[in-house]
């Protein structure tokens, strides 16, 4: 079950591009709406299941959803499930979201948070360089040469009426390959 958007202060949030539509069912829909409507540059949300992915998708904003061992979450945030909850960074561009992620890095401890047991895992999955430096890559052919990305179709829940989404995944993999990256499909 997803979180629901609700506000006793000003009513429920609506999609800023079409106010007759919901901003999504994610509990961080206000975060997505505020970024999409240019009220703020970025917003932090909490995700248990799809509370930041839904608002990012429905409001056309970028999202960085770090894994639990990258960004500490046990510093006072209220979540529904300690095993699933994590922070999401919503912004107008992926570059802005990466800059926020870099700003959340502690100068002494990096991304380690002594209050969060998940950040004590091996740090091999954390870049030593700022994340924002990796968002400025050119879109020219071959710019992604040597990189690999996985398109895992088994995890995509596609109902029979949504078979039209299958060609989208295949064409996205073709675009990735044209940029020089090695997509592997499963």
Where in the sequence are the language-model features?
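Short glycine/serine-rich loop/turn segments
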Residues: 1-87, 115-120, 152-155
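A short helix-breaking turn/cap at a secondary-structure junction
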Residues: 65-167, 171
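Alpha-helical scaffold elements within enzyme catalytic domains, especially in hydrolases
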Residues: 174-175
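Conserved dinucleotide-binding and phosphotransfer motif residues
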Residues: 179
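General small-molecule cofactor/ligand-binding pocket signal
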Residues: 182-186
């Amino acid at each position: 079950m997803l979180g629901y958007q609700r506000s006793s202060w000003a009513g429920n949030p609506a999609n800023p591009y079409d106010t007759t539509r919901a901003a999504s069912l994610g509990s961080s829909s206000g975060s997505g709406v505020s970024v999409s409507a240019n009220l703020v540059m970025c917003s932090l949300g909490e995700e248990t299941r799809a509370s930041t992915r839904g608002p990012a998708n429905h409001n056309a904003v970028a999202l960085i959803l770090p894994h639990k061992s990258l960004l500490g979450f046990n510093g006072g945030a209220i979540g529904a499930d300690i095993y699933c909850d994590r922070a999401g960074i919503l912004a107008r561009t992926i570059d802005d979201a990466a800059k926020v992620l870099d700003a959340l890095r502690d100068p002494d401890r990096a991304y380690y948070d002594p209050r969060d047991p998940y950040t004590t895992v091996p740090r091999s999955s954390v870049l030593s360089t700022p994340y924002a430096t990796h968002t400025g890559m050119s879109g020219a052919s071959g710019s992604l040469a040597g990189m690999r990305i996985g398109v895992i179709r088994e995890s995509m829940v596609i109902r029979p009426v949504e078979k039209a989404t299958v060609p989208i995944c295949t064409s996205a993999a073709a675009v990735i390959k044209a940029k020089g990256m090695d997509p592997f499909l499963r």
